[in-house]
């Protein structure tokens, strides 16, 4: 496992995530470049919403991607950056997918990205994907989403 430590510096088995608003575009690659990262799991504990996984990959540290100056200056666990726009090209993002699933994201923040999977949350399912894949929540949260995530390394 390769999960963040607790506030008491103990190993954790993963993270419970309760979201009332969509989680924006990011990657969960960690911060230790000596590790060989592997997979991330998502266990839905509610049935509301989707997670959008992109084909695009990022090999830097855990990063939240944005073009919003306020978001770029925000402090948090992840680094903040707009460098993805220089990596994946300027191809316009699919307007229908944006409208149906990603209304919380500025469509210009999604330039050059290509969807691999739109995973509909279902109790009892387990989503497993590479930690280098960019991903985010859909904007389809009725009240809240609750899930459990883990990260692995080799």
Positions of PLM-derived features:
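A short coil-to-beta-strand element that immediately follows conserved catalytic motifs
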Residues: 2-15
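Catalytic core of non-heme Fe(II) oxygenases with the double-stranded beta-helix
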Residues: 18-133, 138-154
């Amino acid at each position: 496992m390769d999960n963040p430590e607790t506030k008491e510096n103990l190993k954790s088995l993963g993270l419970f995530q309760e979201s009332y608003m969509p989680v924006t575009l990011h990657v969960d690659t960690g911060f230790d470049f000596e590790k060989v990262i592997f997979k991330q799991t998502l266990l839905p504990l509610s049935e509301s919403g989707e997670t959008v996984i992109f084909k695009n990959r990022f090999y830097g540290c855990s990063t939240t991607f944005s073009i919003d100056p306020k978001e770029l200056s925000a402090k948090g666990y992840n680094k903040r950056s707009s460098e993805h726009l220089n990596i994946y090209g300027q191809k316009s993002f699919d307007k229908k997918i944006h409208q149906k699933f990603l209304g919380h994201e500025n469509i210009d923040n999604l330039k050059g990205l290509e969807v691999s999977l739109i995973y509909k949350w279902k109790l009892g399912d387990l989503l497993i994907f590479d930690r280098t894949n960019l991903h985010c929540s859909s904007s389809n949260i009725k009240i809240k989403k609750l899930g459990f995530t883990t990260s692995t390394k080799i």
